């Protein structure tokens, strides 16, 4: 079968957490799914994150962060999947 790409943007409250999660995510790649981490950063989910996700068909995963007001507005119209965990 064909390998599917899963593009991911990871945001967290601190950079070290984001980097650790990105490394764990990359290890989830297998012969069916290739996890591609496009961005890892600290801070709330921004409109720029949503725009990158929309243009690259990525999902955004946030840990101890939330989308800011602009990101919330844009994610709906762009159809971007944003998942937050705390």
Task: Tell me what each language-model feature is.
Residues 1-86:
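Conserved structured catalytic cores and adjacent interaction surfaces
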């Amino acid at each position: 079968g064909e390998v599917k790409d899963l593009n991911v943007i990871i945001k967290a409250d601190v950079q070290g957490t984001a980097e650790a999660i990105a490394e764990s995510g990359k290890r989830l790649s297998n012969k069916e799914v290739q996890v591609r981490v496009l961005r890892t950063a600290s801070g709330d989910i921004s409109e720029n994150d949503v725009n990158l996700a929309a243009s690259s068909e990525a999902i955004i995963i946030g840990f101890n962060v939330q989308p800011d007001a602009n990101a919330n507005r844009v994610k709906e119209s762009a159809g971007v999947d944003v998942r937050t965990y705390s």
